[in-house]
Amino acid sequence: MSSAEALAFDVIVIGGGHAGCEAASAAARAGARTALVTHRFDTIGVMSCNPAIGGLGKGHLVREIDALDGLMGRVADRAGIQFRLLNRRKGPAVRGPRTQADRKLYRLAMQQMITEQENLTVVEGGAADLVCDGERISGVTLADGRVLKCGAVVLTTGTFLNGLIHIGEKRFPAGRMGEKPALGLSERLLSFGFTLGRLKTGTPPRLDGRTIDWQSLDMQSADEEPVPFSLMTDRITTPQIECGITRTTPETHDIIRANLHRSAMYSGSIEGIGPRYCPSVEDKIVKFGDRDGHQIFLEPEGLDDDTVYPNGISTSLPEDVQLEILKTIPGLEKAVLLQPGYAIEYDFIDPRELKRSLETRKVCGLFLAGQINGTTGYEEAGAQGLLAGLNAARRAAGSEPVILQRTEAYIGVMVDDLTSRGVSEPYRMFTSRAEFRLSLRADNADQRLTPLADEVGILSKERRKRYLTRETALSHARMVTQSLSITPNLAGYYDLRLNQDGVRRSAYDLLSYPDINLDRLIAIWPELASIDPVTREALEIEAQYAVYMERQQSDIAVMEREERLLIPSGLDFDAISGLSNELKQKLKQRKPETIAEAQRVDGMTPAAVALLIAQIRKFGGRQKLAAETLEGKGAA
């Protein structure tokens, strides 16, 4: 192989964080010759902030990444040291699988998967510039002068894009603590005409767990039976640990109030907007100062690591103030601070500059994923990375992009929110963002998305086999329970209280009743005892939601019709009579591709949508007439 060939790829992914790893893996699985460009191999898969994966809404994203044969779920299963299913007492649609993770195990597991992936080469070095041929991406220039040629680029810069760390009055350029920022790429993106903004996130101090008074604290245990993220994980084998729980005190709050002027957040040093749902401890005291305390979870960062992450006291106060704060918190009075908490500002691009494939509208072949799009969180980044990497590979191969709809995945909800509405603060996934969350459950992610992964060629043979085995078992169990039925009178004999209407009900129908599960039905039909535990749970959840799903299907059908109604690329929004100038301007700026996207533009009313549809039909008629005229001239 010549040196020129060695530096030529189909897809180049810049950044080795959660978005970058998923993007590189997805592109390589799709058959693209892929390069992952990162400063150092040993930083691939680093958990920059909280050592945890999943949670409410976020756990759904991890399951969807896994259903598409991504990495995060399998890596988290290997590294998880405290698995807990959040919202366990609520319905399955809003339950959130979560685990604390051993930072080292997570990083090493991710690096192993990246190393073992076919078609994927890790290139150590900093990305200095993007190379374009006209309005199409054609390569990446590295800081050492090497030029990598490609057909598509996925940019996953995280907090590195003009990153600036703040600790009280101190501030210095960094991508995260101890690592250099990416300084040249923002200027290149501005030269392309992109709109850049500044966002902020923060992290708490790190503590020496050996100096914490664990005996005085309440402890929280892992679930007795850990539930894995991945279909490919049979059971969790990593030892499980406890974490401690403490609270801030009125004395803590007094110290924070007295030093707000020294906080980078409140001194005016920080321009960027921080995440609403992950506030700094300063924010908590300013906005919720009437509370007598705020909860802190003391999360060990590894099985053989004494570092503890105090979840709940993210801060940009000076180091000396952070030390004073620790002395006022029960159990932390003698805690040794290993690293101060800090805030970090970074550049991001208005995600309305993107298509739903995550390709930029201005530069063909340039895809963005993760915090550069205004999101926060490993899970949001990983999900975007997978979609961007897949579509980058398809762009390089000349194939149509994969678009996930709001009706089929939380990934689709997130991408649609970002590209149609933009962000005014870091975007975090919640189940409440999805209109059809009864359909988009964590437990059925494989059923929703694995067939798609198979169709587009990113599914391994091992996963296909396991998925089909599980689906066959569920299909058989469904068929059996639907074939067995009972009258209300006979059901009463087994202490099942049904409406005495004379209508026979199947075992499947009975599972939709809140107080009836498979254990109770085995007393009537002993053959149901042969259904394995995994299939049993899936069947019970499916039956429980069956009635609601039938009702929701009509709403889904309406949205899918709107998604299919495309807006022609040549449509002149200025020519739509009756549409306000403000809406015309917004439509020209956003360039919605479907009626469903247009409906989510701020200010779009039903009347405005009707005008738009009428213009599309008129445009379609003119296009047809023009084609017929050309055809007639050709015949003459």
From Swiss-Prot:
Amino acids binding NAD(+): 274-288
One function term, GO molecular function aspect: flavin adenine dinucleotide binding
Gene3D superfamilies the UniProt entry points to: FAD/NAD(P)-binding domain, GidA associated domain, C-terminal subdomain, tRNA uridine 5-carboxymethylaminomethyl modification enzyme MnmG/GidA
Pfam families hit by this protein: GIDA, GIDA_C_1st, SAM_GIDA_C
Residues binding FAD, per UniProt: 15-20
Principal subcellular localisation of the protein: cytoplasm
Cofactor: FAD
Protein keywords: Cytoplasm, FAD, Flavoprotein, NAD, tRNA processing
Subcellular localization(s) per the UniProt record: Cytoplasm
Any one GO cellular component localisation term in the record: cytosol
UniProt-listed GO biological process terms: tRNA methylation; tRNA wobble uridine modification
InterPro entries xrefs: FAD/NAD-bd_sf, GIDA_C_N, MnmG, MnmG-rel, MnmG-rel_CS, MnmG_C, MnmG_C_subdom, MnmG_C_subdom_sf
Assembly with partners or alone: Homodimer. Heterotetramer of two MnmE and two MnmG subunits.
Cited function: NAD-binding protein involved in the addition of a carboxymethylaminomethyl (cmnm) group at the wobble position (U34) of certain tRNAs, forming tRNA-cmnm(5)s(2)U34.
PANTHER family linked to this entry: GLUCOSE INHIBITED DIVISION PROTEIN A, PROTEIN MTO1 HOMOLOG, MITOCHONDRIAL
Family from the record: Belongs to the MnmG family.
Name of the protein this chain belongs to: tRNA uridine 5-carboxymethylaminomethyl modification enzyme MnmG
The organism's taxonomic lineage, starting at the top: Bacteria, Pseudomonadati, Pseudomonadota, Alphaproteobacteria, Hyphomicrobiales
